[in-house]
UniProtKB/Swiss-Prot annotation:
Its main location: mitochondrion. This is ATP-dependent zinc metalloprotease FTSH 4, mitochondrial. Residues 655-682 are annotated as: Disordered. SUPFAM superfamilies: FtsH protease domain-like, P-loop containing nucleoside triphosphate hydrolases. Binds 1 zinc ion per subunit.
Length: 709
């Protein structure tokens, strides 16, 4: 602001011509090159220099002829400079009068509004445009032209107009466009560089340029595999062939090229393949079906070729493909071409024009029905070995194998655990042992006990206990009688599975549960077993009706009815156990829509008859053994969880107490008539004996240990 004050003082004290000549002759070059340097401060100085110069131009013509308007403005200026500014800006025809312009500039300087004048800024831009030659050669030429025009008296006339330049309204849009154009160009450059790198390094990035390396030393042996003796026996032939191929080929025979291991998850298919490699002592190539697919077309087929090429160099060897159904699924004409390329290449490598000698391919899958028929035909996968879930002896062996790594107490009986885990796979048994070990560690025990194994088994089979669930006393009592009815009918029904455990502790989605386990592995079920299963299923609802009445039954038996109906319908439609329908199998998967109305009606009548008979049988048993039912329910309310052995012990004690009471009542009836005093003594003695027996039974019942509490 200092330079502006200097110009204001000069305007008041010196003639305009002198100021103009001094500015023109002594102007510094750095003021005229403000645009070149680009600094914000220099640019402002240049603009303000031009503004002051315009004021000097106006004051330059003070000694010329003064019209009446200019004289009037001069007189007004002495008393009211603001009025001069208002008059000049409101009268456009005064803008061409040099004397009036001089008075206007002096008034702006007087009131210190020189920088805020819109009119002066417009005049300054007009001088810059009219004096420029192309792209802003310099501010000095504009100032010279403006000064010369002022000297000649033609500034603001028709021959030398004041040009108006408006700022571009599309400046922001142009900036956005330039930014977008720069980003697009950058993206194209990066994409091009990436494509070049990808073209040269895609094989290295996807691992295609690296040769597949086998596992040379497999530590797994057949002795480590338990519970699948039949599968091990079939795979031993492969081991003998890999050890001595000439033994089998000198007679003209050919060993199978491929072995397909089929079975449920967790049965040890992968472990069997590793055991084959460990026993034979040959290189072992392992891969998964999903590893062949990639986002790039043709990568899967390329990887199959690389795998078999590496295997040929190390023949004899084993190639193991886990989850082969990922690439070996049945082909569909609607599938994309790249989806079939991998499978086609695998088919060619297994049995194509070029024979692969000494390469044994072992594949594993859980869904053999989904594989392509061309893949499983003889010549590719000649042998299909089923690896089922282990039987009771196999489960015991698997448990022993896993328990070798765990500290166990002397009370552990693995045969009991094996018998109580039907349908468990090897992976399930390994998980059971691990859960038991973690439970023992959490309890601070020094070894895994039988209770830990039982806890792990119940947690896997029945779900975790929900002891924090808030249940009313009425609901607990109803659940105890409901589950007690199931257990009691199972004990007194011929053909029913033995009761393993009864509990009223909520597990999973149930409020209580009675677990029944077979004494041995079962491959089929008899009619007697199925009818007994129906009786046990109906016992829960029967118990609720007998104890609480018809109006107090609950929805807790819904799952029992659903399972019983499913079993009864299977007996009628699948197993030929209905005299009315005969030995005919009916497809009921479509809800009977494929059958006639008469047939469906007959099936439903037979199913209803089976369920009604089961209901009546359960009602007869619970009515006959009502006292045992009450004792068992009270024991469940007290201990919450009871094992099968504990339930039998409680029922035996209840029966013994009842028999003693019956004998005590019948004894006086059989005794001959005697004097009143001896008879009274005998009666008192019998009553005392009965009371003592009842007290003893109650004490023994309280001594039963609760497992789930």
């Amino acid at each position: 602001m200092a330079w502006r004050r200097v110009l204001s003082q000069l305007a008041r004290s010196r003639p305009a011509s002198t100021i103009y000549n001094e500015l023109i002759t002594s102007r510094p070059s750095w003021l005229l090159r403000g645009d070149v340097n680009g600094g914000g401060t220099l640019k402002n100085l240049n603009e303000r220099y031009q503004s002051s110069f315009v004021g000097s131009l106006a004051r330059r013509v003070q000694n010329l002829d003064v019209p009446s308007e200019a004289s009037l403005l001069k007189e007004i200026y002495k008393s009211d400079p603001e009025r001069v500014i208002q008059i000049f800006e409101s009268q456009p025809w005064l803008h061409s009068n040099r004397l009036a312009l001089s008075e206007y500039v002096k008034a702006l300087v007087k009131v210190d509004r020189l920088d805020d004048s819109t009119l002066l800024k417009t005049l300054r831009r007009g001088m810059a445009v009219s004096g420029g030659e192309g792209e802003r050669v310099g501010s000095s030429s504009a100032l010279k032209s403006a000064g010369q025009a002022t000297k000649d008296g033609i500034l603001g006339t028709a021959n030398a107009p004041i040009h108006m330049v408006t700022s571009e309204t599309g400046h922001f849009k142009d900036q956005i466009w330039r930014t977008f154009r720069s980003l697009a160009l950058t993206f194209l450059v990066i994409s091009g560089i990436g494509a070049l790198i990808e073209d040269r390094g895609i094989s290295k990035g996807l691992g295609l340029s690296q040769e597949v390396q086998p596992i040379m030393d497999s530590k797994t042996k057949f002795s480590d595999v338990k519970g699948v003796d039949e599968a091990k026996a079939e795979l031993e032939e492969i081991v003998h062939y890999l050890r001595d191929p000439k033994r089998f080929t000198h007679l003209g025979g050919k060993l199978p090229k491929g072995v397909l291991l089929v079975g449920p998850p967790g049965t040890g298919k992968t472990m069997l393949a590793r055991a084959v490699a460990g026993e034979a002592g040959v290189p072992f190539f392992s891969c998964s079906g999903s590893e062949f697919e990639e986002m790039f077309v043709g990568v899967g087929a390329r990887r199959v070729r690389d795998l078999f090429a590496a295997a040929k160099k190390r023949s004899p060897c084993i190639i193991f493909m886990d989850e082969i159904d990922a690439i070996g699924g049945s082909r569909n004409p609607k599938d994309q071409q790249y989806m079939r390329m991998t499978l086609n290449q695998l088919l060619v490598e297994l049995d194509g024009f070029k024979q692969n000698e000494g390469i044994i391919v072992i594949a594993a899958t859980n869904f053999p029905q989904s594989l392509d028929k061309a893949l499983v035909r003889p010549g590719r996968f000649d042998r299909h070995i089923v690896v089922p879930n282990p039987d009771v002896e196999g489960r015991r062996q698997i448990l022993e194998s896993h328990m070798l790594k765990v500290l166990k107490s002397d009370d552990v009986d693995l045969m009991i655990i094996a018998r109580g885990t039907p349908g468990f796979s090897g992976a399930d048994l390994a998980n059971l042992v691990n859960v038991a070990a973690l439970k023992a560690a959490m309890d601070g025990a020094k070894a895994v006990t039988m209770n830990d194994l039982e806890y792990a088994k119940d947690r896997i089979m029945m779900g975790s206990e929900r002891k924090s669930a808030v249940i009313s006393d009425e609901s607990r009592k109803l659940t105890a009688y409901h589950e007690g009815g199931h257990a009691l009918v199972a004990i007194h029904t011929e053909g029913a599975r033995p009761v393993h455990k009864a509990t009223i502790v909520p597990r999973g989605r149930t409020l209580g549960m009675v677990s029944q386990l077979p004494e041995k592995d079962e491959t089929s079920f008899s009619r007697k077993q199925m009818l007994a299963w129906l009786d046990v299923s109906m016992a829960g609802r029967v118990a609720e009706e007998l104890i609480f009445g018809d109006s107090e039954v609950t929805s807790g038996a819904s799952s029992d009815f659903q399972n019983a109906t499913k079993m009864a319908r299977a007996m009628v439609t699948k197993y030929g156990m209905s005299k009315q329908l005969g030995f005919v199998s009916y497809n009921y998967e479509d809800d009977g829509k494929s059958m006639s109305t008469e047939t469906r009606l007959l099936i439903e009548q037979e199913v209803k008859s089976l369920l009604e008979n089961a209901y009546n049988n359960a009602k007869t048993i619970l009515t006959k053994h009502s006292k045992e039912h009450h004792v068992l329910a009270q024991a469940l309310l007290e201990h919450e969880t009871l094992t099968g052995a504990q339930i039998k012990k409680i029922l035996a004690q209840a029966n013994s107490t009842q028999q003693q009471q019956e004998h005590a009542v019948e004894a006086p009836r059989k005794t001959p008539a005697a004097p009143s005093s001896p008879a009274a003594s005998a009666a008192a003695a019998a009553a005392a004996t009965a009371a003592a027996a009842a007290k003893q039974a109650a004490a023994k019942a309280k001594g039963v240990a609760g497992i789930g509490s």
